[in-house]
Amino acid sequence: MEKRNQKKRQQNAHLSCELCRERKVKCDKLDPCTNCASAGVVCVPVRRPRLPRGAHARRLRRISPEDPEASIRIDISPGAGTAADEDLKKRIRRLEALVDSMRSSASQSSNQDQESRDAIESISNETEDASAPTPDSSRMPLGDGGLRVLGLSGPSNLEIGWASIIEDKETTTQLCQVYLLNVDPVIKILHRPSVERWMLQGERYLGFPERHAAVESLGSAICYVAATSLTETQSWARFHATKSSIVARARRACEAALEKSSPLVSPEVTTLQAFVLYLVARRSEDPSRAVWTLMAFAVRIAKALDLPGGADETFFGQQMRKRLWLTICLLDFQTSLSQPSEPLISVVEATASFSPPRHINDSDFSLTTSHDIPDREGLTDTTFSMVSYHVQVAGRLLNFEPSVGDYETRQQHVQQFEQRTLRLLFYCDPESTPYAWFTWHRIQCFVSGARLSAVRPLRHPRGGSTSCMIPLTGTNESAGPLSLALNVLEKVQLVHTDPRGEGFRWFVTVPWRALAIAISECYVCQDRALMQRAWPIVEAAFQQHEAAVSGSSKAISTTLERMMCRIREKLSLTLGTSAITASPTFGITSIATTLSVPHTPPSQSSITSSGDLLSNWPWPATELSHPGPDLALVAGVAPISSSLPKLDPLLHSLDNQLVIAAQEPLVDADQSWAWEEVMASLHHDETIGADMFLS
């Protein structure tokens, strides 16, 4: 009983007196204290129970029904309580005002920092054991449109001068030139002549007033995505700095400009264009799931602006809206492939709203164009983007549409895709420009990818069911999924090794699905010669993929690494130890000397005979007989009866390739289990972890 009474008496602690608190000196807590006695003043002691600290205070607030904003009652000596309480409230209000002001601005001046530190220190000494009250969250400024919640503004302590990259006209001009060379040909959402007149010649952009928030955000987004498209060599040549430093500065400037323009509530299409360019650049720079998450906002904003069905009065506005909506659909499809999820835009909505823009050059129309312009033949500024738009529609149907289950239906979708896209290559000379060369080879890669989707669809198993994969077997081993996957990987490496692909390397990564198919097919392949050709390509692609997603993508990396270990064990017995030990050292720089794809520019006369053509796939021709060795596909195909216009001699025998093999699927468990294991493993990783993988 005595111990309990003693403990109860000790709860009323003798704290520092009022004068020692004001002077911020150590109090010996005597009555009177030594400091007050030596100063000759009246000592006002403070006695009250100690308040809970840390976790105890938080737990008490959770279970307490009292108002959290209620004032703290302090029992002090008579005559001094009112003054102390008023002084404490005054300091708390000053601290709250400083916190609100700090949250409303990105950077703080040195005097504000010192004042806030003094206020915090003063409050800490004044309340000693009390927990500091938190400001009401409803009073937080919301003028940034909510983008701070999305983490776009980055850390609050940005260094001074971070926006100088946008204010520097010379740097902005060079980044705009990089954008027009590297980004605009593949991400076609802006009008090239208008951008040139605005950023290179100093004119106003599309009638917007000077320093409009939407225009400034678009300019900063152009600089950011241009910086991410640079190679290290280009960065040193143009800016005498590393690419990482240029990208970091441009990203901070872009995020600050986006906060100012408030894309979540802005009615301007220009602001959404800036946000989409930010997502493109962020996806190229950051392999995490951030862009996958932010895509939901882009889709919602686009629907709020009525991009899919909105009818603009001018031809210019119609083209810009169609380009922007289809680019958002493309990004939605790409991010869905890079994460274990289905696209946000459904297959029905994507196909119903698919209205491609005109296949024309940007110089063919302007803001004042009042009449319709017909499509052009040959390569235009929008050719690659038009193909990309068709890719996302075909990819959704082949991979995410449950009704497209049988092999014949997928054949029809692939055939329609090839008919629409290969027509865009009419009169395209891959030797004319780097853009033409890149478009030529990427379309071949897209066609191979579509054919892979027909035989190896990306369909996550649900409820224990297996995916609707169609295994292919036959006497011609070079005509199966392995050769299709190898062609995709070779085309990716070609872009990363040929000088003509330097400006577009930022846009091309190793697709994880083609790599996974190649690994799984290599594991069950019985053709020794094909394996000797395929293994260096697969090993190099695996190393490049691992380097690109290092530290951020665990699900697919774990699955691929596990399968690579198994296939290395198998090949060490079949191909010999020398072949396996040499593969891990197969660097990216030596790919050009190992791949079977030609790396020298083909001559005009050799293109139609034995070059790197879609027409070189060994399918039986209906009208022409110019098959070549580049891309092999399934033998015994049915000819297509389509009346396509006659092609330029450059694509002499391309019209007979607009068909996918119409053979009966042959089921072979030995050649189908590997891909099923990949999908099952990815599905398992999806359910047990939050790590995502890069496409």
Curated annotation (Swiss-Prot):
<dbReference type="GO" id="GO:0003677">
    <property type="term" value="F:DNA binding"/>
</dbReference>
<dbReference type="Pfam" id="PF04082">
    <property type="entry name" value="Fungal_trans"/>
</dbReference>
<dbReference type="Pfam" id="PF00172">
    <property type="entry name" value="Zn_clus"/>
</dbReference>
<feature type="region of interest" description="Disordered">
    <location>
        <begin position="101"/>
        <end position="146"/>
    </location>
</feature>
<keyword id="KW-0805">Transcription regulation</keyword>
<feature type="compositionally biased region" description="Low complexity">
    <location>
        <begin position="101"/>
        <end position="113"/>
    </location>
</feature>
<dbReference type="InterPro" id="IPR050613">
    <property type="entry name" value="Sec_Metabolite_Reg"/>
</dbReference>
<keyword id="KW-0862">Zinc</keyword>
<dbReference type="InterPro" id="IPR001138">
    <property type="entry name" value="Zn2Cys6_DnaBD"/>
</dbReference>
<feature type="DNA-binding region" description="Zn(2)-C6 fungal-type">
    <location>
        <begin position="17"/>
        <end position="43"/>
    </location>
</feature>
<dbReference type="GO" id="GO:0005634">
    <property type="term" value="C:nucleus"/>
</dbReference>
<dbReference type="GO" id="GO:0000981">
    <property type="term" value="F:DNA-binding transcription factor activity, RNA polymerase II-specific"/>
</dbReference>
<dbReference type="GO" id="GO:0006351">
    <property type="term" value="P:DNA-templated transcription"/>
</dbReference>
<dbReference type="InterPro" id="IPR036864">
    <property type="entry name" value="Zn2-C6_fun-type_DNA-bd_sf"/>
</dbReference>
<keyword id="KW-0479">Metal-binding</keyword>
<dbReference type="InterPro" id="IPR007219">
    <property type="entry name" value="Transcription_factor_dom_fun"/>
</dbReference>
<keyword id="KW-0804">Transcription</keyword>
<comment type="function">
    <text>Transcription factor that specifically regulates the neosartoricin B biosynthesis gene cluster.</text>
</comment>
<protein>
    <recommendedName>
        <fullName>C6 finger domain transcription factor nscR</fullName>
    </recommendedName>
</protein>
<keyword id="KW-0539">Nucleus</keyword>
<keyword id="KW-0238">DNA-binding</keyword>
<dbReference type="GO" id="GO:0008270">
    <property type="term" value="F:zinc ion binding"/>
</dbReference>
